Swiss-Prot record:
One of its GO terms (molecular function) is structural constituent of ribosome. GO terms for cellular component: mitochondrial inner membrane; mitochondrial small ribosomal subunit. This is Large ribosomal subunit protein mL66. Belongs to the bacterial ribosomal protein bS18 family. Mitochondrion-specific ribosomal protein mL66 subfamily. It comes from the Eukaryota. Pfam families: Ribosomal_S18. Signal peptide: none annotated. Component of the mitochondrial ribosome small subunit (28S) which comprises a 12S rRNA and about 30 distinct proteins. Keywords: Mitochondrion, Ribonucleoprotein, Ribosomal protein, Transit peptide. PANTHER family: 30S RIBOSOMAL PROTEIN S18, LARGE RIBOSOMAL SUBUNIT PROTEIN ML66. It comes from Bos taurus. SUPFAM superfamilies: Ribosomal protein S18. Residues 1-34 form a transit peptide.
Length: 196
């Protein structure tokens, strides 16, 4: 049904374009999606509510730093994003989750590496669930091995975390985050700790 409507409206535009002459050049193009506003018109006892197409909006505003070498630098976002900003990160990734190359994104080398690290961290945190490569038909992925395979003698639920990983002056710390993001702005009073 939708295909029939598109065909009929396309033929109608084509015929209108032929009848009005060569002065109108927009008949061959599909209709542009403009912004619409709702207008109420009162005629006696009847109220007509119609949507009118308004003019197209202005182009995007000028960046605050037009001399920057990449989009992140131009919009002064250099140290102001993290792996949680998925709307920003989704502009630099492909539909299946991989990074777009620098020739397409226009990022400088430093920011490309930071965005790449943030995308990895967002994938690991489960913040980008829709960006996964599609599996071919009939292919079933292998089940992942359970993480605590070494605990086969007792139930995995009986495990307690290791609260004390050594003396305070000689603890074995776990790496968290990425050293590439160490210059990012911290909005809390605590300093950034890369080892917990």
């Amino acid at each position: 049904m939708a295909a029939l409507n598109v065909l009929v409206s396309g033929c109608g535009r084509f015929l209108r374009g032929l009848l009005t002459g060569p002065t109108v050049t927009s008949w061959a193009r599909p209709p542009a999606r403009g912004f619409r506003e709702v207008v109420e018109i009162q005629e006696g006892k009847t109220t007509i509510i119609e949507g009118r197409i308004t003019g197209t909006p202005k182009e995007s505003p000028n960046p605050p730093n037009p001399s920057g070498q990449c989009p992140i630098c131009r919009w002064n976002l250099k140290h102001k994003y993290s792996y949680e900003d998925v709307l920003l990160l989704s502009q630099f990734i492909r539909p299946h989750g991989g990074m777009l190359p620098r020739s397409i994104t226009g990022l400088c080398q430093e920011e490309h590496r930071k965005i790449e690290e943030c995308v990895k961290m967002a994938h690991r945190a489960g913040l980008l669930p829709n960006h996964r490569p599609k599996l071919p038909e009939g292919f079933f992925p292998k089940t992942r091995p359970r993480l605590n395979r070494y605990l086969t003698r007792w139930s995995p639920r009986s495990v307690k975390p290791i609260y004390n990983k050594g003396h305070r002056w000689n603890k074995v710390r776990m790496a968290v985050g990425s050293p590439l993001l160490k210059d990012n702005v911290s909005y809390t009073g605590r300093p950034l700790v890369l080892y917990h």
